[in-house]
């Protein structure tokens, strides 16, 4: 019998969509060349919309929501990643058109992954999460335009 793992799955219904807690197996994972054992994910505004169906965030059904995650590579056909590597993902349509971080595992394209920065745990990376990453990009853009805190 195939090993299973827990997941939240958004499924299409006559009335819109439903969120269910299910057990999946590797054969249920979407296409990709890296399989990651998900350790942490976050709950972002977009995730809330996807979970409730309040906005059409999910574009493919059934789908595991979760626009980001951090975890450990389980298997890889991408030469940049090996089993045991710690990685982070955010963006790339994950949680919208490709299954995301609200499952025990995710299979994604290696181009979408970033090695976990040294000195950070997967938990710490997701404590910052997509919202923190977005905020930092905004700060960097301000700095690139010469704006300083004292301005």
Q: Where are the model-predicted features located?
A:
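Cytochrome P450 core scaffold surrounding the K-helix E-X-X-R motif
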Residues: 46-52
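NAD(P)H dinucleotide-binding glycine-rich loop of Rossmann-like/cofactor-binding domains
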Residues: 90-151
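Glycine-rich beta-strand-centered segment in the early N-terminal region that forms part
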Residues: 27-43, 54-94, 100, 112
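Short polar catalytic/cofactor-binding loops
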Residues: 11-15, 41-43
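Eukaryotic N-terminal low-complexity, Ser/Thr- and Lys/Arg-rich leader segments
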Residues: 1-6
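Short glycine/threonine/proline-enriched tight-turn/helix- or strand-capping micro-motif at secondary-structure
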Residues: 15-25, 54
